[in-house]
Amino acid sequence: MVDWTDPERSAIVGLWGKISVDEIGPQALARLLIVSPWTQRHFSTFGNLSTPAAIMGNPAVAKHGKTVMHGLDRAVQNLDDIKNTYTALSVMHSEKLHVDPDNFRLLADCITVCVAAKLGPAVFSADTQEAFQKFLAVVVSALGRQYH
């Protein structure tokens, strides 16, 4: 269990209320697939991922990006129990999908970049970034929990 300070909790929940999950999710997943092309192997059913433009315009990428962000919403709603909230997802990603757990960190970095670019430094201050990155690190840890 993570001990969140009141300012961290406030920063995470406040920032989350400003994030458009339907905008940031597709951007972040597309960025991951472009910047870390080896991650594309997990998305072979998504169709054309051959160029950055194809990835950015791919409806399956957009849909899954939204799914990822809605999954993060579950973590925001369960800040005190993120590990248990993500148990089933961790099992699925490790045992069924065989996703390298480091890919979760890479996606978290892409989410951070997209949020910062969208909201700017007035909203995404250093203190807010610190709390958000701590939150994402806890999510990444929870997703990697079932790996051996």
UniProtKB/Swiss-Prot annotation:
One of its GO terms (molecular function) is haptoglobin binding. Red blood cells. GO terms for cellular component: blood microparticle; haptoglobin-hemoglobin complex; hemoglobin complex. Gene3D superfamilies: Globins. Residues 3-148 form the Globin domain. Heme b binds at residues 64, 93. The keyword Transcription regulation does not apply. GO terms for biological process: hydrogen peroxide catabolic process. It holds the Pfam family Globin. Involved in oxygen transport from gills to the various peripheral tissues. Heterotetramer of two alpha chains and two beta chains. Belongs to the globin family. This is Hemoglobin subunit beta-4. The lineage of its organism: Eukaryota, Metazoa, Chordata, Craniata, Vertebrata.
